[in-house]
Design a protein with these regions (language model features):
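Protein-protein interaction scaffold domains that mediate dimerization/oligomerization
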Residues: 1-82, 90, 97, 211-212, ...
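Beta-propeller domains
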Residues: 106-130
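Conserved beta-strand positions in repeat-built beta-propeller and related beta-rich domains
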Residues: 106-110, 146-147, 154-158, 196-203, ...
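Structural signal for beta-propeller blades
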Residues: 112-115, 160-162, 204-206, 248-250, ...
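Short loop/turn segments that connect beta-strands within beta-propeller blades
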Residues: 118-122, 166-170, 210-214, 253-257, ...
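Blade-level signature of beta-propeller repeat domains, shared across WD40, Kelch, NHL, RCC1
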Residues: 314-371
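A short beta-strand motif characteristic of beta-propeller blades
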Residues: 78-87, 123-135, 171-179, 215-223, ...
């Protein structure tokens, strides 16, 4: 059978099936509603039958969510490879962040710098990671993020420090300012309230804190009892996500309370989860370094494998506002960009903004908002 004809038949069958469900449920509702409203009791319907129907409907709704998700998303749709701007001088890229205007921030293994790239992957700026002073010393950033005020922030594991880059400095090119000490900072992010999030790998903690305009730490909070926390990111509904070394991925709410782990909620078995992020529709995306995959965990439905091949050692992970998935492939020394949606990622409750949108303010273009 011709592939096009076969696909057309499958489409017709799917639409007819969904339509039949809609018609039958509408008809039943129209007939049952007045009977239940105007008569006492349930007629001959038993409690067991109601329970059975509820369970079947729950399963059907789950299946419909899966069908919808499988129509919306695409697998292994690689659209671009961005070479490591450091070349082969250092290790592969490991930390990655994408701002509102589409600018890409990258750290690489053993590289004393942060690269800032355009949407298309062209280098816009290089921030050398050097502490200026009597004895200028370089440091090696593990991961990178951007604060609400547009400042670049990094985790420096070797020096057990968190640093932000300030352009307002006595040095003409700006300077890195140490804002705090953490035993073993690994991943860094920003939560929905603008606080900086830092994973403390050996201590099994995530620290969150705010900064005032004098770079003083305020409103500190710590989440404990984690097992080798690696990457941290803003999560859906104002919470945050944390990946654990060779373990699970956990979602915390904005009160720093555990909501669930992805393993327990979705029944998913990770190998070694690394980069985590959430897209603008509230889906959670996770890179698995051991399995060399990227999975999407939707709000409703089963997990979907977005990338099942072509990754050697996926580490950092981020989503752009234009609906693309960016994966730092340390093993292949590049950033791999995937188009994982059939259409642009926008809806009535999740407005989509292109990095080329003229409606972006100058502050939005730099990812900048007040602290």
């Amino acid at each position: 059978m011709d592939y096009t004809l076969e696909a057309t038949h499958h489409k017709e069958k799917l639409l007819k099936t969904v339509y039949a469900l809609q018609v039958k449920s509408d008809t039943t509702l129209q007939k049952a509603s007045p009977l239940l409203s105007n008569h006492h009791g349930m007629g001959m319907v038993t409690e067991h039958q109601v329970h059975q129907l509820a369970e079947k409907v729950k399963g059907i709704c789950h299946d419909l969510d899966n069908i919808k998700n499988l129509l919306y998303y695409r697998q292994n749709n690689l659209v671009q490879q961005i070479p490591n701007p450091n070349g082969s001088s250092y290790g592969g890229p490991s930390g990655i962040h994408c701002s509102l205007d589409g600018s890409i921030y990258i750290t690489s293994e053993n590289a004393p710098c942060v690269h800032i790239l355009s949407c298309s992957g062209q280098t816009q700026q290089l921030l050398p990671c050097i502490e200026w002073g009597r004895e200028s010393e370089a440091f090696l950033p593990e991961d990178v993020t951007v604060t609400r005020s547009g400042m670049v922030a990094v985790a420096d594991m070797l020096n057990r420090a968190i640093c932000v880059f300030s352009h307002h400095s006595r040095f003409p090119k700006g300077e890195w300012i140490k804002i705090g000490k953490v035993n073993s900072p690994r991943g860094i992010g920003v939560d929905s309230s603008g606080k900086i999030l830092v994973t403390d790998y050996t201590q099994g903690k995530v620290h969150s804190f705010a900064l005032d305009h004098a770079f003083k730490i305020l409103s500190t909070h710590t989440v404990s009892n984690l097992c080798g926390p690696r990457y941290v990111s803003l999560g859906p509904d104002g919470g945050f996500l944390v990946s654990e070394e060779c373990g699970d991925v956990k979602l915390f709410n904005n009160q720093h309370k555990l909501v669930y782990s992805l393993g327990s909620k979705y029944g998913h078995q990770f190998g070694n989860p690394s980069g985590v992020c959430a897209d603008i529709e509230g889906n959670i995306l996770v890179a698995d370094e051991q399995h060399r995959t990227v999975h999407l965990f939707p709000k409703s439905g089963s997990p979907i494998c977005l990338v099942s091949e072509g990754l050697r050692k996926p580490t950092g992970l981020t989503c752009s506002t234009s609906g693309q998935l960016l994966v730092a492939d340390t093993g292949d020394n590049c950033i791999k960009v995937f188009k994982y949606r059939v259409r642009p990622a926008y809806s009535s409750d999740a407005p989509w903004v292109s990095c080329d949108s003229p409606n972006l303010t100058p502050r939005q273009r730099t990812g900048s908002m007040p602290l």
